[in-house]
């Protein structure tokens, strides 16, 4: 029903709407993901402009209309200034926002994803962006109940023996033993060190990431396979990855040569 309500939220997207308005996609902490109109915000003297920019975290007062909400007031909580001053950090911020937008459906309340996005944006202001992205990917998959099985074959449950590279396939939900390889679509070869790093990212808190030693080669492996898992389960391309690659933002991830190594016939 129509009426006023308050919510803290992060602006995921904005686009021009009519002559002076904008239409925002906002992930709120308590009311899920919603679309809201901000009337007159493109006018030079609009008091709503500062708190309704993309990537802003603000406290909003909404009027719930029959089809769309309208932002009537907003109070800025965080603008994430360091991200706006560094193109690489900004590119990764767009990437995190795109993941959150894909995970949360319209109207769905997902406080855990909201807090994860808030923490990820804060971490981007001080940590290596590629490391933050890998941690964010790992935690998003875990939050969705989709964390891959890495300690044994995801299909036959055989223990993965030896010290060689491990084949990991998004379609299989994790690692594959030699007998199960070649039939699960795209597979990525990841070193044992890369697998261990992924497992660490699943359980480490943000503060510990500051002390984590970054191995560029291992991060390069994970920089291919972890986004592939998210894209597989979201069933969509993460377009902001192209922007990151375009500006060389993944350089810390190493040479980036861990491309898919096998593909099942007909896929």
UniProtKB/Swiss-Prot annotation:
Keywords: DNA damage, DNA recombination, DNA repair. This is DNA repair protein RecO. Involved in DNA repair and RecF pathway recombination. InterPro entries: ARFGAP/RecO, DNA_rep/recomb_RecO_N, NA-bd_OB-fold, RecO, RecO_C. The keyword Chaperone does not apply. Transmembrane segments: none annotated. The keyword Nucleus does not apply. Belongs to the RecO family. The lineage of its organism: Bacteria, Bacillati, Bacillota, Clostridia, Moorellales. Pfam families: RecO_C, RecO_N. It comes from the Bacteria. HAMAP family: RecO (MF_00201). PANTHER family: DNA REPAIR PROTEIN RECO. Gene3D superfamilies: Nucleic acid-binding proteins, Recombination protein O, C-terminal domain. GO terms for biological process: DNA recombination; double-strand break repair. SUPFAM superfamilies: ArfGap/RecO-like zinc finger (SSF57863), Nucleic acid-binding proteins (SSF50249). GO terms for cellular component: bacterial nucleoid.
């Amino acid at each position: 029903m129509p009426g006023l309500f308050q919510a803290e939220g992060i602006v995921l997207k904005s686009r021009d709407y009519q002559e002076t308005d904008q239409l925002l996609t906002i992930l709120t902490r308590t009311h899920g993901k919603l679309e809201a109109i901000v009337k007159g915000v493109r006018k030079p003297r609009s008091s709503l402009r500062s708190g309704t920019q993309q990537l802003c975290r603000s406290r909003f007062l909404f009027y719930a209309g029959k089809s769309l909400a309208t932002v009537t007031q907003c109070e800025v909580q965080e603008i994430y200034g360091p991200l706006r001053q560094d193109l690489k950090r900004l590119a990764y911020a767009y990437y995190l926002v795109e993941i959150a937008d894909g995970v949360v459906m319209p109207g769905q309340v997902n406080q855990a994803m909201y807090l994860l996005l808030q923490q990820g944006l804060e971490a981007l202001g001080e940590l290596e962006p590629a490391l933050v992205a890998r941690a964010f990917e790992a935690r998003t998959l875990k939050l969705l109940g989709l964390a891959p099985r890495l300690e044994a074959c995801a299909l036959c449950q055989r223990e993965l023996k030896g010290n060689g590279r491990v084949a990991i396939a998004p379609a299989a939900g994790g690692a594959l033993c030699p007998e199960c390889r070649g039939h699960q679509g795209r597979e990525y070869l990841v070193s044992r060190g890369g697998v261990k790093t992924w497992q660490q990212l699943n359980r480490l808190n943000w503060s510990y990431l500051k002390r984590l030693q970054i191995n560029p080669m291992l991060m390069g492996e994970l920089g291919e396979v972890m986004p592939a898992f998210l894209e597989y389960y979201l069933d969509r391309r993460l377009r902001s990855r192209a922007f990151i690659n375009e500006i060389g933002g993944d350089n810390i991830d190493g040479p980036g040569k861990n491309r898919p190594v096998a593909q099942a016939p007909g896929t």
